[in-house]
Amino acid sequence: MPTPALLVLADGSVFRGFSFGAPGTAIGEVVFNTGMTGYQEVLTDPSYYGQIVTFTYPELGNTGTTPEDDESDRPQVRGAVARNICDIPSNWRSQQSLPDYLKAHRIPAIYGIDTRALTRKIRTVGAMNGGISTEILDPVELLQKVLAAPSMQGQNLAKVVTTRTPYEWTEPTPAAWEFRPQTATEEPPLTVVAIDFGVKRNILRRLASYGCRVIVVPADTPAETILSYDPDGIFLSNGPGDPAAVQEGIETTRKLLGAQRPMFGICLGHQLLGLSLGAETFKLKFGHRGLNQPAGLTQEVEITSQNHGFAITAESLAQTPVEITHFNLNDKTVAGLKHQTLPIFSVQYHPEASPGPHDADYLFGEFVAQMRAYRQQHPRRQ
């Protein structure tokens, strides 16, 4: 017999289903992801820390799980919600079923509910806190715990998911999955310092595949320490939570701007770059989470992978030295920035995909080109 489970939202909505994860109770912000594939990458993406993810695609777990697809060392979500669950996966790469994977990592999850109704609720009312439980099956009691939980707004979660010590990343994209092979070069590798606000492994793989030596540092690393590596470029990673609350990241980025070195930001890193330049951010009603978000400016459109609940206020960029390079074409929110005089740019989406389309992978190539140009103008001291 399946174990009964309960999902309660902060507005009092109640959904009854069955457990496909670990027993217990999980409280977090309930959001939805519209991707048809890549559930393991979603579950292990640090940007989802503190959230309960609803998968809108009705079938989940069909291909099982494999350590190769993890975007971090463990699942980062508080919980998961699905319509139907596959207990017996069918894929040659699978090493563990999704239910067993979640149980091993102590992540509660619920299936058998009307995920379409839940998604429409979030889309209409907005993302809100909720709770999944196999031990509290009284909606009133679970609602009390949900209402006592803090809002995502104002939370600095980057400090929770960041690495504790610096390390060097050397693993490129596996040859079997490489879709844009790089030509071998005799030039020395470029040094990139990646500030880890919750970085995905595939971002680091893409940088390594483009010939970069990648040094990953904690989110609170001072600008002086970062510059002591004499980097050819600085990368601002993705991550969870409210960007305006990541004050150490904003201050560090502001100081690094003075070094005038190439800088590339993705997702939270994009928002921190905007904040460091004097822009403002706001919380989206229900966020952008999926693999088919159109982004562009004029005649060219990229289909992108996105995962964020905050965005830069377009009007606040008027007095900053940047120009908008991309909009999200669904709601016209800012999706890309470029500094007017410095080799600095950022995007609100994920060019590394994993999961998702590869339309924007060229941005890593642009970052590399900027770094090589910088190093030609500023030769490394022998």
Swiss-Prot record:
Record pathway: Amino-acid biosynthesis; L-arginine biosynthesis; carbamoyl phosphate from bicarbonate: step 1/1; Pyrimidine metabolism; UMP biosynthesis via de novo pathway; (S)-dihydroorotate from bicarbonate: step 1/3
NCBIfam families in alphabetical order: CPSaseIIsmall, PRK12838.1
Job of this protein: Small subunit of the glutamine-dependent carbamoyl phosphate synthetase (CPSase). CPSase catalyzes the formation of carbamoyl phosphate from the ammonia moiety of glutamine, carbonate, and phosphate donated by ATP, constituting the first step of 2 biosynthetic pathways, one leading to arginine and/or urea and the other to pyrimidine nucleotides. The small subunit (glutamine amidotransferase) binds and cleaves glutamine to supply the large subunit with the substrate ammonia.
Keywords for this protein: Amino-acid biosynthesis, Arginine biosynthesis, ATP-binding, Glutamine amidotransferase, Ligase, Nucleotide-binding, Pyrimidine biosynthesis
Family statement: Belongs to the CarA family.
Active-site residue list: 267 (nucleophile), 350, 352
GO molecular function: ATP binding; carbamoyl-phosphate synthase (glutamine-hydrolyzing) activity; glutaminase activity
Name used for this protein in its record: Carbamoyl phosphate synthase small chain
HAMAP family noted in UniProt: CPSase_S_chain (MF_01209)
Record-linked InterPro entries: Anth_synth/Amidotransfase (IPR050472), CarbamoylP_synth_ssu (IPR006274), CarbamoylP_synth_ssu_N (IPR002474), CarbP_synth_ssu_N_sf (IPR036480), Class_I_gatase-like (IPR029062), CPSase_GATase1 (IPR035686), GATASE (IPR017926)
Assembly mode: Composed of two chains; the small (or glutamine) chain promotes the hydrolysis of glutamine to ammonia, which is used by the large (or ammonia) chain to synthesize carbamoyl phosphate. Tetramer of heterodimers (alpha,beta)4.
EC class: ligase
Catalytic activity: hydrogencarbonate + L-glutamine + 2 ATP + H2O = carbamoyl phosphate + L-glutamate + 2 ADP + phosphate + 2 H(+)
Protein's GO biological process: 'de novo' pyrimidine nucleobase biosynthetic process; 'de novo' UMP biosynthetic process; glutamine metabolic process; L-arginine biosynthetic process
Enzyme Commission number(s): 6.3.5.5
Binding site for L-glutamine: 47, 239, 241, 268, 271, 307, 309-310
Chain positions covered by the region annotation CPSase: 1-187
Keyword ATP-binding included in the entry's annotation: yes
Stretches assigned to the Glutamine amidotransferase type-1 domain: 191-377
SMART domains reported for this sequence: CPSase_sm_chain (SM01097)
Family matches, as PROSITE patterns: GATASE_TYPE_1 (PS51273)
UniProt cross-references to Pfam families, sorted A to Z: CPSase_sm_chain, GATase
